[in-house]
Amino acid sequence: MAEQETTSNINTINDQAEEETRTKSQPLISGLPNDIAELCLLRLPYPYHALYRSVSSSWNKTITNPRFLFSKQSLSISSPYLFVFAFNKSTARIQWQSLDLASGRWFVLPPMPNSFTKISSPHALSCASMPRQGKLFVLGGGDVNRSAVVYTALTNRWSCISPMMSPRTYFVSGNVNGKIMAVGGSVGGNGEATTEVESYDPDNDTWTVVKKLPMVLAKYDSAVIGKEMCVTEGWAWPFMFPPMGQVYDSDEGTWREMSGGMKEGWTGVSVVIRDRLFVISEHGDFPMKVYCSDDDTWRYVSGEKLQGEKMRRPFAVTGADDRVFVVASGINVAEGRVSEGQNGDFSVEWRMVSSPKSSIQFSPASCHVLYV
């Protein structure tokens, strides 16, 4: 019996060795040197990489290699795509979809694992991203065993990562120095508020404990500015008390109270453009504001206003370079170009982006820009 198992293991090893040898010797594109063929593969458009990988084992190995995305970025071939996490209140359906910002075409992503499709509300989850690595992270939902998944754009696939140490719901998350932080929220079946914070390292697939929040904060909004993560609970009716907020310094590993001007003027969903904090206000004609740390004040951004007849709440906002993307009900998208004048004032110019007709009943819960 032992001899049969040994023989079987040897055969398996030999088969693997033969497959590796065949893959190495197999040209990527017949008649072309592999270095030239790789340049051709680098220009294959997203989201069809899953189909391209099925062409041959050599294509699959090349496209799934982390060096492939690095090469696209170093050659300035990677392009920004807008990813939207949307939900339908009537049917409780949730889905991710992506917009090619160059062509205006929309794609629906593969569904997330089942444990994430049975949640009570999309806001029970929290989403973060690593734009230049082309990865989306979806956390939470309360499932002890499957509380974290990652979407990799190059493979167009979801995969489970190590579960969070404290599975939670209704919390905020963000990418701080290449690590994904999960802050606060509710834990347990009774929804008990928590101040616990943890950080995920994608390099070794591990979670570690981070210094706790000094206080419980209701989920509203958060933003990562440089090496700091700002968390605010926002204003709450009847507006008798100013909102609370905390700022995490990743260099010091400590929390400090958010300045009064920052937390009191944070009256909308935020986006960080070139290390400056902006918000799209959720009242009136949805004016855009920018935070000025020098005097702890907010200033209105001049220029056009969002088209109120097309842009209806709820909003999800993200940014890339000097552009801001606002996703509204019906998955209507407005793209704003932000510019800074010589006097330090900011202005914005808006344009509407095509929205998928099939998503008219959907509303956004989160959005991110990835480079693919």
UniProtKB/Swiss-Prot annotation:
Domain F-box per the UniProt entry, residue ranges: 29-74
Induction: Rhythmic expression with highest levels at the end of the dark phase, just before the transition to light. Induction by far-red light requires phyA.
Pathway stated in the Swiss-Prot or TrEMBL entry: Protein modification; protein ubiquitination
One Pfam family per UniProt: Kelch_1
Keyword vocabulary terms for this entry: Kelch repeat, Phytochrome signaling pathway, Repeat, Ubl conjugation pathway
GO biological process, one term: red, far-red light phototransduction
Lyase among keywords: no
Swiss-Prot/TrEMBL Kelch repeat ranges: 80-126, 135-178, 179-227, 229-276, 279-325
Manganese as UniProt keyword: no
Gene3D superfamilies found in the cross-reference section: Kelch-type beta propeller
Description of its domains: The kelch repeats form a beta-propeller structure involved in protein-protein interaction.
Subunit structure: Part of a SCF (ASK-cullin-F-box) protein ligase complex. Interacts with SKP1A.
Function: Component of SCF (ASK-cullin-F-box) E3 ubiquitin ligase complexes, which may mediate the ubiquitination and subsequent proteasomal degradation of target proteins. Part of the phyA-mediated signaling transduction pathway leading to the regulation of gene expression and hypocotyls elongation in response to red and far-red light exposure.
Protein name (database record): F-box protein AFR
